[in-house]
UniProtKB/Swiss-Prot annotation:
GO BP of this protein: transmembrane transport
InterPro entries the record matches: MFS, MFS_trans_sf
Residues glycosylated per entry: 341
Protein encoded by which gene: crmC
Name of the protein: Major facilitator copper-regulated transporter crmC
Protein's cellular compartments: Cell membrane
Domain of life according to the entry: Eukaryota
Length: 585
């Protein structure tokens, strides 16, 4: 009897341990593995994660700091190229008579480039960071070469699609490099640090573009970066490959032959990659986001069958993906434990809110400043850069704050979200020519500081909730959630503008100019600034812009309210714990 009782007790104890193991969170399991085997790669991790761990286990502090410096240079080059491209693309448009084809390519490349981050994240884990980086650097360079050498809109469209896919992928992989080489406590500061090139390129980019326009051509403005990117980015990948080989030679990383036939390898990667789940999720995002972009550029209306059917099918595919991942996927595309995590859900909602807010008030902000405040191009550009520069500078300070306090949730909830709400709300009041522009600068600073807090906090939330394997996928998820919110914000801003500006303009114009209202509206800021400040026509135009901006700012302010419950969903993580192995910052 006693033996039976002891056996039952042992069985119950084992069952309790297994049950407890199932309830342990992913981040706790990851930390336990690091504490128990700090100098060994994680044996059950995917090969890409093992390579990243092996690199960190064999390189020195000097190599780590040098690599960070080189990553900063890569971000500087990437941001500089993007800034120059944003200015030179208008001169490229001028050379083609079929610009709408370029707009279609812009829509598709933006959507595809964003959605591809999910399979890229999976590829980095299954294959390796350096390998994926080299592939997409190649795609980026090929895209730039095609753009620089194209002879028409079709060639430009093809090149721009390749360019944008490569650009978003390379930017994403650089962020993953930083996550691999930083501890959780210092990661917020590391992320903010690599964003600081924006401060330089925000002002240098337009000047460089002007120099290219004055002394060269738009083709060379693109083409020269094919050379610069090759000699800047390839050495970074070779550094990671060098230390990976060093880890193999020292026995830290042992590559075991799989022994699989080509057919078995295909089946293995088909199962590990979860192609069905990847297809469902990518299709859901594409079908949902694409119609909003098509509407924004005038290719499809809200009432069209194309718009409605694509949005409905896209929305329905999200629960289909969730059901597949939960009950049918042999290997989950996104770990179910992360998929249902309240912190991850709240972070995705917040990302959508941030981008919805930004694109709602920002879409027509440039033209509003030019017309209502009669600013020249340079001063308008400086005004629109306040958010980028301000949020970047503040993010560095917030990164230091997180390092010292070891927490971020309360700061986002009680400082970041209220400050963004305050800035957006004050924009409602201080819009229009009757208000001094200094008040708008103040509002922009509030929004920038709030945004800098929330963006860094959002990234930290998903990374703190994930294990080492899940970090790339979580970064991709909040990026996609941001695209989700941004697409809706674009569409809402466009709808508000189209339904308020023409009517307000028609009401305000003198009777003898009412017949020109369509020309003034369709001509945009270029036609509107031709009317002298103080004239009846210019006053009517300013009033129309004020009305349009009022409703856009009201919408942007209202959506920020959702940030509070989204942040409240987060777990109040302590970042003073282990998430990565080896020598990291």
């Amino acid at each position: 009897m006693a033996a039976t009782t002891e056996k039952d007790l042992t069985a119950r104890t084992t069952a309790n341990i297994e049950a407890a193991s199932d309830t342990v969170s992913l981040e706790e399991k990851s930390e336990r593995e690091i504490l128990e085997r700090p100098n060994e790669i994680t044996q059950d991790a995917q090969i890409g994660v093992q390579k990243a761990e092996a690199t960190a286990l064999v390189w020195s502090k000097t190599a780590l700091y040098a690599t960070y410096a080189w990553i900063w240079v890569c971000f500087f080059i990437l941001n500089l190229q993007f800034s120059i491209s944003n200015n030179m693309i208008y001169y490229a448009y001028a050379g083609f008579s079929s610009a709408p084809q370029i707009s279609q390519a812009y829509i598709l490349s933006t959507i595809i480039g964003g959605v591809l981050q999910l399979p890229i994240a999976k590829t980095l884990n299954l294959w390796g960071r350096a390998e994926g980086f080299l592939v997409f650097v190649g795609v980026l360079i090929v895209g730039i070469i095609v753009i620089a050498s194209c002879n028409g809109p079709n060639g430009f469209a093809a090149g721009y699609t390749l360019y944008w896919i490569g650009y978003t992928a390379v930017n994403f992989i650089l962020v993953v490099f930083v996550a691999d080489a930083s501890g959780l406590r210092n990661r917020a500061f590391a992320y903010a640090f690599i964003g600081t090139p924006t401060i330089c390129t925000a002002f240098v980019g337009p000047l460089a573009a002007q120099a290219f326009y004055a002394h060269s051509t738009w083709r060379w403005a693109y083409g020269c970066f094919a050379i610069v990117i090759f000699f800047t980015f390839v050495p970074l990948a070779l550094v990671f490959k060098f230390y990976q080989r060093k880890a193999e030679k020292t026995g830290v990383f042992v590559r075991d032959p799989s022994g699989r036939t080509p057919l078995q390898s295909f089946r293995h990667y088909f199962r590990e990659f979860d192609l069905v789940g990847a297809f469902l999720l990518m299709a859901a995002f594409v079908l949902f986001l694409l119609p909003f972009s098509l509407e924004t550029y005038g290719f499809s209306g809200y009432s069209s069958a194309t718009f409605i059917s694509m949005v409905v099918i896209g929305v329905l595919l999200f629960p289909v993906f969730a059901i597949w991942e939960r009950f049918f996927a042999p290997t989950a595309f996104i770990k179910w434990q992360l998929f249902k995590n309240r912190t991850v859900l709240g972070a995705c909602i917040l990302a959508a809110v941030i981008f919805f807010n930004y694109y709602t008030w920002d879409q027509y902000y440039y033209y509003y400043l030019q017309v209502v405040y009669n600013l020249n191009t340079a001063n308008t550009g400086y005004m629109t850069q306040i958010y980028s520069v301000g949020s970047t500078l503040w993010a560095v300070l917030f990164g230091i704050w997180i390092r010292q306090t070891k927490h971020f949730q309360k700061t986002c909830l009680y400082f970041g979200a209220p400050l963004m709400l305050l800035g957006a709300g004050l924009m409602i009041h201080f819009r229009g020519a009757e208000s001094k522009i200094g008040y708008l600068v103040m509002c922009q600073i509030f929004i920038a500081f709030g945004g800098g807090t929330l963006v860094i906090g959002d990234e930290m939330a998903v990374m703190a909730a994930a294990d080492r394997d899940g970090v790339p996928m979580m970064i991709a998820m909040i990026s996609l959630a941001g695209s989700f919110g941004g697409a809706i914000g674009y569409a809402v801003a466009g709808a508000i503008y189209a339904n308020t500006f023409p009517q307000a303009l028609l009401r305000g114009l003198p009777d003898d100019l009412k017949g020109d209202s369509a020309t003034v509206y369709l001509g945009g800021s270029t036609a509107q600034v031709m009317y002298p400040p103080g004239s009846a026509a210019r006053n009517a135009i300013n009033h129309a812009w004020t009305e349009s901006q009022k409703y856009e700012c009201i919408t942007a302010t209202a959506v920020v309210v959702l940030a509070f419950p989204a942040i409240a969903m987060w777990k109040n993580y302590n970042v003073d714990r282990k998430q990565v192995k080896g020598t990291v910052i």
